[in-house]
Amino acid sequence: MGIKHLYQVIQENAPDAVKAGEIKNHFGRKVAIDASMSIYSFLVAVRSDGQQLMSETGETTSHLMGMFYRTLRIVENGIKPVYVFDGAPPKLKSGELAKRFMRKSEAAEAHEEAKEVGTAEDVEKFSRRTVRVTREHNEECKKLLKLMGVPYINAPTEAEAQCAVLARAGKVYAAASEDMDTLCFDSPILLRHLTFSEQRKEPILEIHLDRVLEGLDMDRKQFVDLCILLGCDYLDPIPKVGPNTALKLIRDHGSLEKVVEAIQSDPKKKYTIPEDWPYKDARELFFDPDVRKADHPDCNFKWEAPDVEGLVKFLVEEKAFSEDRVRNGAARLQKNLKTAQQSRLEGFFKPIAKTEQEKATLKRKHEEKLELQKKKKKEEAKAKKEAKSKPRGAV
């Protein structure tokens, strides 16, 4: 799930932190990809008539189709991926996982009902909500990656946290995930939409954490506190606290401790903190997650030549893929993994740090930009209100 409304908050308050571009812009870079999030998106997106793609024996193959062709696209654009798989979830996440399971069970019932009496759109909607990544999906994807010559790592717990470790250590350029909480784990750069299909024509979003903090005028602790307040996988959000309120509370009080204190001492009792709300434990999971250090042997990875006959045996003989397509894909993979050995020039240069004066100027310009945006929104809201209040037919 990640952090609710975080991307919206960044867009509105730190727009310079986000850079949209084409996949080819990342040629020559190594990227750590959140495998479980990618597999989930493959299961949801790679479908036929609202159903999972399946082999002749009734086995789901959407995850393998997605992993094979999306990885091929990434490699053909000169990127060297390393996939990171989730381990056991932290205990604090068990509540959120239980809720997700309940939602999927309810969706499964609604899906069956929709098949009986609903529209095609209803069937598709509820079918998507029942999607769950299983251990078997993960193991089959690991087998496929090994045959493709693409490395993978098993994280002790959260894949995003392990991706962030690799990015901070410079082993990869960025962490790639749709989960915004990757930034809470201190990944310097987050890439979104990297494993999306080409048909979706979504730009790759590159989010820089240092620019996020600069735009929000927060340190990392305040940023993590904001994310917890927005709503994360570890805790229920505080009822009635939306993104604008969460941002204001952190800016006014500076920390979650002081926010909680202010809410509890408010005589009007405007907000109610959930009874079991261990925000300090959640913060600790972001600051000290269970991860392997970048120099751990399990974090040493390399790209190999694909095992073409192994791919044919697995995908064609066992999963009924087209042999011509698999062999063609393997040949393209072999060719492009060699090409991706090239380095980017940026690896030889260090960015020049901004002076205090430059930082102050940028901050002032950013604040002026925000004020203009707020003014424009107010004017639009006012015009909308006036238009509604006019009698029908009035000019």
Swiss-Prot record:
Mg(2+) 2 binds at D179, D181, D233. InterPro entries: 5-3_exonuclease_C_sf, Flap_endonuc, HhH2, PIN-like_dom_sf, XPG-I_dom, XPG/Rad2, XPG_CS, XPG_DNA_repair_N. Signal peptide: none annotated. Residues 122-253 are annotated as: I-domain. This is Flap endonuclease 1. Its EC number is 3.1.-.-. Keywords: DNA damage, DNA repair, DNA replication, Endonuclease, Exonuclease, Hydrolase, Magnesium, Metal-binding, Mitochondrion, Nuclease, Nucleus, Phosphoprotein. Residues 357-389 have a biased composition (Basic and acidic residues). It comes from Blastomyces gilchristii (strain SLH14081) (Blastomyces dermatitidis). Gene3D superfamilies: 5' to 3' exonuclease, C-terminal subdomain (1.10.150.20), 5'-nuclease (3.40.50.1010).
